[in-house]
Amino acid sequence: METATLVTIFISGLLVSFTGYALYIAFGQPSQQLRDPFEEHGD
C-alpha cells in the first residue's frame, strides 16, 4: 500500500474513534453524571 493510503485510513480511523467516544460520553453511561443547566434554571 502507498503511504498516502495508509495515512488516510489512519486519520479516518481516528475520526471515527473520536466520534464514537464523543457519542458514548454524550449519551452513554457517563452522561448520567453530567449536569443540565436548563434543569437547574427554574423559571
Swiss-Prot record:
One Pfam family per UniProt: PsbN
Regions crossing the membrane: 7-27
Primary location: plastid
GO CC aspect terms: chloroplast thylakoid membrane
Originating organism: Dioscorea elephantipes (Elephant's foot yam)
Bilayer topology annotation: Single-pass membrane protein
Domain of life according to the entry: Eukaryota
GO biological process: photosynthesis
Keywords: Chloroplast, Membrane, Plastid, Thylakoid, Transmembrane, Transmembrane helix
Cystine bridges: none
Subcellular location: Plastid, Chloroplast thylakoid membrane
Role summary: May play a role in photosystem I and II biogenesis.
UniProt cross-references to PANTHER family, sorted A to Z: PROTEIN PSBN
Protein name per its UniProtKB record: Protein PsbN
Family as reported in the entry's similarity comment: Belongs to the PsbN family.
